[in-house]
Amino acid sequence: MFNNLVWPKIPGIADFKGNYFHSARWDHAVDLNDQRVGVIGVAASAIQFAPAIAPKVRQLSLFQRTANWVVPKANEPYSAAQLDFYRAHPEEVKKSRDETYRVWNSLCTFQDKAVLADIERAGLERLAEVRDEQTRRKLTPNHPFGCRRPLFSDVYYPIFNRDNVSLVTDGIERVTPKGILTRDGVEHEFDTIVYSTGFETTTYLNALEVSGRHGASLRDAWRDGAQAYLGITTAGFPN
């Protein structure tokens, strides 16, 4: 599922004269130190690598189409005092585990409104750490938690407090030989562009060719959605 890259349908990608690559096929031969770097896409991939490259690049511009919910990972290491407490009170370990299960089970089903409200509150509290009001507003989601794939990070929002990091929300018109032209007429010049645009996860059999009678393609037959009798049999194809 996560091996078929998606490249955005933006005109001019091949016209760019600098380095460019997909985040899932990272080009380690490209030295990003002191470079001007543009990142298209700010979801699950970007929140992982953007904080890692921000300290080394000269300028990092992230192009965002839709603001996502980015909430704390809640993955802090246990302190020595906490470890001593759990050793002395093993019954508390089970209570903690049960509470963790309850929260994550509610999160996965998106049915516990109280849990969802707490998560949104935690996300907004972390977002409030972004000092620039305009950037903070651009990063604020306009949809409830769970409508899009939720993201978990403790280090993404802090990069926007760096002087060399900017968030661009104007739509992209095209890629140019020098960089990215946005719909407001501004050309953003870069040395390297990273496409953090995800994977093809919704097309059936996108990495596998199944042929039926007379050379028919199962991928074409299922282009508008997969259908099979009892979930196992499709007319005209091997079953």
Which residues does each PLM region occupy?
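Glycine-rich, N-terminal phosphate-binding loop of Rossmann-like dinucleotide-binding domains
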Residues: 1, 24, 184, 197-198
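Rossmann-like dinucleotide-binding core of oxidoreductases
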Residues: 2-129, 165-166, 217, 235-239
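Core beta-strand elements of the Rossmann-like FAD/NAD(P) dinucleotide-binding domain
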Residues: 31-35, 183-192
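Generic beta-strand/beta-sheet core signal
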Residues: 40, 63, 168-170, 183, ...
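Short beta-strand to alpha-helix junction loop
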Residues: 110-119, 144-155
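Short, surface-exposed acidic
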Residues: 130-141
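Glycine/threonine-rich phosphate-binding loop and adjacent beta-strand/alpha-helix elements that clamp
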Residues: 192, 196-239
